[in-house]
């Protein structure tokens, strides 16, 4: 199907729990939610295998758990496997867990692209992984996205490759992740080069960003009986041009 909108939540099984495409099939999935799915092995949110093609836009992939049987399984989020292809445009991967490739794993001669997305707080050895199987390497391209840990949050083995450009390693400032709100603060710096908020959900709040100002200089006035020390700050994100009480600093 193309143009499908899905809500896939709280399923459990062995593998490919939330969604599976297998064989010569294609799917376009938009504005969808894959949340809270659990796999004993791999691909808790879902996977694409054996030459399938998937195009995901503005999708939330959150709180999915793989490798519950305690092995070395990957892909708490999605798996792209065995000659398949996946495109993830402005998606949010958060709080997915697996032994490795906890958000997304590409393997056995497959390819995937991630663009304008947020990959944050996905427990495991790495959030993004490109791996070989039966000596078939894989490729993953990551553009204009927040990836926790930057390059160290991604892994490619000796037969696989990860290419990246426009990678950001910075807190996206989710609005209320503890309660499932993965939209971002209006002052978040997770912004694409074309000016849109990264991830699936856009802006949803303000006031979660507390930016610390840098101290530019400290000048102690000699012989003033310890009365005064002058501290000069750079301008804060919260500063205004006029007098107000909105200036906020961390010292």
Please give the residue ranges for each predicted region:
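Short, flexible loop/turn segments with low-complexity composition
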Residues: 129, 157-158, 200-207
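Short intrinsically disordered, low-complexity coil segments enriched in acidic
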Residues: 1-10, 209-215
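Beta-strand signatures of extracellular beta-sandwich domains
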Residues: 248-250
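Predominantly extracellular beta-rich ligand-binding scaffolds that present long acidic/polar faces
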Residues: 5-9, 15, 20-181
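C-terminal accessory segments
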Residues: 164-206
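Short secondary-structure junctions and interdomain/linker hinges
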Residues: 63, 196-198, 225
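A broad, structural micro-motif
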Residues: 140, 184-185, 213, 246
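Pro/Thr/Ser/Gly-rich low-complexity, intrinsically disordered linker/stalk tracts
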Residues: 208-245
């Amino acid at each position: 199907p193309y143009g499908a909108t899905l809500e896939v939540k709280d399923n459990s099984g062995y593998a490919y729990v939330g969604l599976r495409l297998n064989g010569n099939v294609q799917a376009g999935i938009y504005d969808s939610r894959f949340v809270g799915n659990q796999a004993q092995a791999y691909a808790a949110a879902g996977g694409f295998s054996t030459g399938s093609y998937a195009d995901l836009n503005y999708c939330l992939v959150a709180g999915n758990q793989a490798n519950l049987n305690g092995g070395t399984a990957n892909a708490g989020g999605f798996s792209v496997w065995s000659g398949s292809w996946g495109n993830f445009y402005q998606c949010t991967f958060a709080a997915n867990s697996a032994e490795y490739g906890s958000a997304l794993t590409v393997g056995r001669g497959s390819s995937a692209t991630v663009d304008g997305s947020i990959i944050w707080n996905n427990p495991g050895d790495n959030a993004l992984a490109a791996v070989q199987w039966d000596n078939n390497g894989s490729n993953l391209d990551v553009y204009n996205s927040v990836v926790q840990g930057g390059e160290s949050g991604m892994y490619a083995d000796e037969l696989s490759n990860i290419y990246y450009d426009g990678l950001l390693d910075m807190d996206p400032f989710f609005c209320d992740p503890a309660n499932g709100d993965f939209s971002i603060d209006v002052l978040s710096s997770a912004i694409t080069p074309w000016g849109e908020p990264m991830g699936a959900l856009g802006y949803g709040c303000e006031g979660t960003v507390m930016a610390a100002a840098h101290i530019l200089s400290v000048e102690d006035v000699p012989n003033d009986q310890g009365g005064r020390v002058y501290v000069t700050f750079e301008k804060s994100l919260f500063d205004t041009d006029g007098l107000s009480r909105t200036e906020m600093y961390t010292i």
